[in-house]
């Protein structure tokens, strides 16, 4: 491999050289903050611009970009950013090399050569490019319908993650390929189904007493609370539990390392559940009052139900075996779910009598279809203000100046019912038949008992005693006086990459809930809620005046027949099915694609996806670079880097930070900000963005001003409820959104305040919402719309009903999923979390004889983010080649030594990576690196076929609910790459001319990628 020559000193020295080169060139004619606000600086004076890093595409690290004479010369951590503690990782520092890279796209280009060959790019004008796009899209739409045009999106680039929503509406297509399908999406999908959108996000920033780091190395990158924050959280925790097949960086410091076999997370989660239940470590009040655990299951009747709302606002029908008033009484409400009350006789003696004797009910009529008691128990007494009574939270290890948040006391039942969790009861149905019913908890308890530690030990490879010890440590409250659990579970990307993605996430959601860690300090809280829109409100599919496709268009979504729940979810089509449709025309032709930073290497079998890309009639790609995927494009459009654009920014997870991405320097040449490109397309297609006469296609300044309008000193509208003996009344408070006085009239004012103040704490901005815990009790969990929490000042949209509970069909955290039950009636086992053995894994019959090793992948690399940064010299010098981690004992069996190139093979493909001997993986497991390509290779595709790991996967091995690819835990074989078994007689991958890829740290080609400042005007 050669010697790694880049040291920290070299890193800093190179930065100094970069700065000197930057100073030699004058400022751009366009306005950036450093030029506008600090125009008085002269000579070599520098300006530090506070902004938000996007070097890893997910984390909102606060950083400062140092600008000298209009040129960014380095990135530093912002010590005032409480959410990231001044962190500035290698990817962030390398952003300067990305922004000033000689291979940046500067102009629109069109291809001149056939697909599959070197594209022969030719520069064209923006007008020609955009008109060509409109003409081709309209032609394809006229021939095949809007559904023949698909949209694709990846991560980062600030705003592009919602581009597919815009184009879907504009083109009337239901088809969008998203990285979301395999990254965060299954977690968001599952939690939306059973609790609340993205409740997978954990408030690690308040430093829980027990820190559970499950399936990720967030100390390297990714997620709200990563890098320096993660290290600090783990170090301060009383107990740190790491769950990972490999010894991760922080794993060696953990108190418990749950060293599981890849793909067995679901079994381990259910084993933890079994321990929690058997040791009675669950929060009994929460389980009885805020989950559907006490709801009664009747297996002797046909499932029935009611219409309820999808995530997009349309309706679907719940069909459930949970017992309802309509099942026992003609004309009864299908929304009233029955429970058995252990206290019914005592209450009766006190003069409180239930309508159905020992049975009482909870009314989930959240839309008020039948009556207004929806959201409340029979005869309940409830008051919103009493629900807020409590105290300031008391987390021990907050940073100085960090807000604690308000912690309402747990609210007991009033009247003092006691819903039964266990037992079997008889009840007569409306047809006269007497049946036996059991609480959901009994079924859940039985499911968990199938995975006792002794059973899970056989599946996961972790000793039963270690499973029990870790689960007990998590569930046993270190300080019971707090009234809440030890902290949530930071379950990360790895748990999504299996055919059990959704069920895995449900198991974690339940675990967090039953242990009293839902929306509590250090618990799982979901996405940060603030009045600004971190995705640019005006540049989203929810823009004022934006039209949406008719329902019949959504019903055409590709993959919906194979994955019925996608019709409920509606936020992506199945990527596997879409690529198949491009190739086969089944179920209908898909002939065009619009892509913003999407990456065909991230999911599905790469070879199959490449075939589809080469088969498209027309493909447009927006990007910073020439990439493997856009080598198949017909037109490529250059976009701005994160230091070259403006965007409001709030933590996407639970870190609770609000700030901005600030334009520090001008983009090069003709590169544009994604929203401006899409707005131009809308104008050319005569698709009105707003309903404001004369401003149908607003410019970026209007959009930025619009994005911060609801940030105000006024108290935004909220609702309080008063319920007496089951009869509710409500009262509106605060200022209607259309009447609020914006705190900042313009984006520039907001940015100026941000430069002076730094990052704001969402707890201070929205004290009734993000500043308050247990929002399911106060009503604030339902304060915003059911998915994104967006507010639309134009029509009062986005405001919820402020009723206590969750946004689920039962208004409870659903241990028994009515969504799953309704969409998969033929799979009753899926109503509760399940464990499924990975396909093509070590239990896959005789296959293990030919493919004896289990492959996992996806680990975080300090200098890369998925496929990004392979052309940045600092990063590539430190990590020039993909590495496969192999246990030294295993390597010895195969005659493999450190640094050898190794073939890794399945029946679907084979790749080469470099052996990295590491005792941190088990002897029967190898750990592969993912999404590798080689920018130095000029052949079409830039050498993706050499090392791209997803060539090895079964294209049709998918999660049956979300369609997520099975990206890990499959069997492979390995053997040493030799001159005899390698093309060009070279174990090192070579391009079509026989030239090897960059594979050593001293390759002179790295210097060709050093920053350049010419040709940007």
UniProtKB/Swiss-Prot annotation:
Record note on modification: Predicted to be exported by the Tat system. The position of the signal peptide cleavage has not been experimentally proven.
Active site per UniProt: 91
Site residues (Crucial for dopamine dehydroxylation activity), renumbered to this chain: 506
Cofactor note: Binds 1 [4Fe-4S] cluster.
Cross-referenced Pfam families: Molybdop_Fe4S4, Molybdopterin, Molydop_binding
EC number(s) reported in the record: 1.1.-.-
Domain 4Fe-4S Mo/W bis-MGD-type, first and last residues per copy: 45-103
GO-annotated molecular function: 4 iron, 4 sulfur cluster binding; acetylene hydratase activity; metal ion binding; molybdopterin cofactor binding; oxidoreductase activity
Assigned keywords, A-Z: 4Fe-4S, Iron, Iron-sulfur, Metal-binding, Molybdenum, Oxidoreductase, Signal
GO BP term, pick one: L-dopa metabolic process
EC class (word): oxidoreductase
Other remarks on this protein: Although all E.lenta strains examined are dopamine-inducible, less than 50% dehydroxylate dopamine. Intriguingly, this is due to the presence of a single-nucleotide polymorphism (SNP) that results in an Arg-506 to Ser substitution that inactivates the enzyme.
Family: Belongs to the prokaryotic molybdopterin-containing oxidoreductase family.
UniProt name for this protein: Dopamine dehydroxylase
